[in-house]
Amino acid sequence: MQQLNPAEISNLIKQRIQDLDAGATAKNEGTIVKVSDGIVQIHGLEDAMYGEMIEFEGEVYGMALNLERDSVGAVVLGDFLKLQEGQKAYCTGRILEVPVGPELLGRVVDALGNPIDGKGPINAKMTDKVEKIAPGVIDRQSVDQPVMTGYKSVDTMIPIGRGQRELIIGDRQTGKTAMAIDAIIAQKSSGIKCVYVAIGQKRSTIANVVRKLEQTGALEYTTVVVASASEPAALQYIAPYSGCTMGEYFRDRGEDALIVFDDLSKQAVAYRQISLLLRRPPGREAYPGDVFYLHSRLLERASRVNAAYVEKFTNGEVVGKTGSLTALPIIETQAGDVSAFVPTNVISITDGQIFLESSLFNSGIRPAVNAGISVSRVGGAAQTKIIKKLSGGIRTALAQYRELAAFAQFASDLDDVTREQLDHGERVTELMKQKQYQPMSISEQAAVIYASNEGFLADVPVEKIGSFEEAYLRYMHDEQADLMKEIDDTANYNDDIAGRLKSSLETFKQNHSY
């Protein structure tokens, strides 16, 4: 009888185990127990993480938001009508990610980064997490470089710096989106990459915005992220974070980016809807208790990071460059009520706000910026030298004008100084008006503000200020192109530039009509 060698048997078993190819990968599995309004309750999935992607049958995905003792509450990122009770759900082990990189520039994508512009697939080489921790205090650098919006009223009185969060707030139909789109168009020569996130808007409105960006050549350096009004609340909630991740790609590699959230009021409403469906306890205005955190964790990701952070992030590939992500969140108020829950939250998170007023808009002052309560908390350090030097007179003139205009209604006889201040204020108000889609360069702004400060508009009738400005800038581009280029290139202000501006104004007023 043959003797069995235990060592041989042991080796044979070990060899068989090593050669075994386990075809099925182990997945944490659960069962759908309830489906309603885009929310799924799943029994099981003990290992699910907060924010993890959950896979359902039929290639539908969800995101885990409620981790309870014996079940998981998830929002469906897509068509929840395909799902039924009793179907299986699987953990993926992955937090939600979106494609990032320069391949997304010039494209229109949904909240998950899928192209929706009919221009074919996006062959992005990288993906990144939608939810990320904002850079720490040590990794940041103070804001000291400007983002020119092309608006005289903003760049002079409420300047924005790279890495700043500047809120645009106002009622519906006051020009909030127009201001943000103009800011994107104005970045044509600045090298700043842009991301426009449309949340809860009509598709026709978004199509108009995309068309305008295309016509002005701004789409080539812009990514448009869309979560329209017809899409599930879950996608409207995620879209701003997805857009932020796309913008952070450039920030972390030593480049500058600008992101517009249009608008965060609708994101808060979508999050409220999700929270109530998940049976979370409601608070003030039925918003959940963490609605402040919803916006703070998003807007804290907009920052200016120092060269050490960029060098470490790129493993030494990019040296000596700082990166920035500037945010322009938009909030819609109801009847000018800035003391409502979401507006006060976002005002306290951001580094300043541009307040647009219906009454100014309807009286023809556009952009309808209320200079009194609009403020930029950090932008002053980022202003260019020439604009900083010249803009002091603008804010003073407007403040005095608003104060005196109230008294002038009742007083019949005004002294000469008061009348002079009223006349000057009226002209400055007229000068601050600007047409849509016509952003102005540094040199153009400097030229017209200098004219106002030095009293060259005093004898120009108020109704002719607009035509004077147009004719004067045309003259400057034709006759003083070198001066305009020098101001644009250096942004410096000295006696030589002031003298040349003065003589060009004198020549223009003598020899040209307007």
From Swiss-Prot:
Coiled coil: none annotated. Its EC number is 7.1.2.2. The lineage of its organism: Bacteria, Pseudomonadati, Pseudomonadota, Gammaproteobacteria, Moraxellales. Its main location: membrane. The gene is atpA. F-type ATPases have 2 components, CF(1) - the catalytic core - and CF(0) - the membrane proton channel. CF(1) has five subunits: alpha(3), beta(3), gamma(1), delta(1), epsilon(1). CF(0) has three main subunits: a(1), b(2) and c(9-12). The alpha and beta chains form an alternating ring which encloses part of the gamma chain. CF(1) is attached to CF(0) by a central stalk formed by the gamma and epsilon chains, while a peripheral stalk is formed by the delta and b chains. Produces ATP from ADP in the presence of a proton gradient across the membrane. The alpha chain is a regulatory subunit. ATP binds at residues 170-177. Keywords: ATP synthesis, ATP-binding, Cell inner membrane, Cell membrane, CF(1), Hydrogen ion transport, Ion transport, Membrane, Nucleotide-binding, Translocase, Transport. This is ATP synthase subunit alpha. It catalyses: ATP + H2O + 4 H(+)(in) = ADP + phosphate + 5 H(+)(out). It is an enzyme of class 7 (translocase). It is found in: Cell inner membrane. It is a peripheral membrane protein. GO terms for molecular function: ADP binding; ATP binding; proton-transporting ATP synthase activity, rotational mechanism. Pfam families: ATP-synt_ab, ATP-synt_ab_C, ATP-synt_ab_N.
